[in-house]
Amino acid sequence: MTSLPHSPAADRNKQPILDALTRILGEEGSALEIASGTGQHAVWFAAAMSRWNWQPTDADARVLPAMASRIAEAALPNLRPPLLLDVMAPRWPSEGFAFAGEEEKKFDAIYCANMLHISPWATCAALMQGAARRLLPGGVLITYGPYFEEEVPAAPSNIGFDEDLRARNAAWGIRRLEDVTAEARKSGLTLRERHAMPANNLLLVFGFQ
């Protein structure tokens, strides 16, 4: 049997993120995950949050078969097969796919981990705009990853990581929290909660103003 792609970082952070999610979210609901990658988070969260229906997605069609295999192997009734979703596309999910015919389906939560710093800045605006369209009233957008903050000394590891990202792609880089929250406000979302996480990461919760 071919081994599935594995992210050590996803294994390290999945439990701290889950602990935060269980404090933030209600007992049941529906969640859309953006940039699911290997699907490790989707499986871990869906297994622990059995009353949440979890929809994983990714913008890279090449990762979907392996993610689908991991999800099928998990055999969780509340975890759906992955879909192709590019936040920059005018429709979520992307052209040619649908949420089982529910093209305008909305969610109680949208979750996006480790995407904003490894994609162009335009994806931040697209994420906020799409979340505003796809969230139910009272719903939340939850993002996770490294951020720079005004008046908060940057961790040396994050400074080095940012330099490495920008050397690899000039459009990448750790984002300033103030810029992200300003972009969210343009779409009617405001920062509700900020949670410090291990390894100098933050988990942010946005909701409607």
Where are the predicted features?
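Class I SAM-dependent methyltransferase Rossmann-like catalytic core
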Residues: 1-27
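Class I SAM-dependent methyltransferase SAM/SAH-binding core
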Residues: 32, 40-92, 97
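Conserved S-adenosyl-L-methionine
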Residues: 35
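A conserved beta-strand element that flanks and buttresses the S-adenosyl-L-methionine
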Residues: 111
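A short, conserved alpha-helix within the catalytic core of class I
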Residues: 118-131
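Conserved beta-strand signature within the Rossmann-like core of class I S-adenosyl-L-methionine
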Residues: 138-147
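Conserved Class I S-adenosyl-L-methionine
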Residues: 154-178
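Core SAM-dependent methyltransferase catalytic element
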Residues: 189-209
